Amino acid sequence: MADTTGRIPLWLISTVTGTLVIGLMGIFFYGSYSGLGSSL
């Protein structure tokens, strides 16, 4: 794992990005559904 220093694996980037996107979409949809999204 020493050769990956300073370089992030592509699968890790895609996994983290996908998780963040799904999480943010879920939060926004839940917020708008429960009426709290208007404050954002």
Curated annotation (Swiss-Prot):
GO terms for biological process: photosynthesis. SUPFAM superfamilies: Photosystem II reaction center protein J, PsbJ (SSF161021). It comes from the Eukaryota. It is found in: Plastid, Chloroplast thylakoid membrane. GO terms for cellular component: chloroplast thylakoid membrane; photosystem II reaction center. Keywords: Chloroplast, Membrane, Photosynthesis, Photosystem II, Plastid, Reaction center, Thylakoid, Transmembrane, Transmembrane helix. The chain crosses the membrane at residues 8-28. Signal peptide: none annotated. It is a single-pass membrane protein. One of the components of the core complex of photosystem II (PSII). PSII is a light-driven water:plastoquinone oxidoreductase that uses light energy to abstract electrons from H(2)O, generating O(2) and a proton gradient subsequently used for ATP formation. It consists of a core antenna complex that captures photons, and an electron transfer chain that converts photonic excitation into a charge separation. Belongs to the PsbJ family. PSII is composed of 1 copy each of membrane proteins PsbA, PsbB, PsbC, PsbD, PsbE, PsbF, PsbH, PsbI, PsbJ, PsbK, PsbL, PsbM, PsbT, PsbX, PsbY, PsbZ, Psb30/Ycf12, at least 3 peripheral proteins of the oxygen-evolving complex and a large number of cofactors. It forms dimeric complexes. PANTHER family: PHOTOSYSTEM II REACTION CENTER PROTEIN J. This is Photosystem II reaction center protein J.
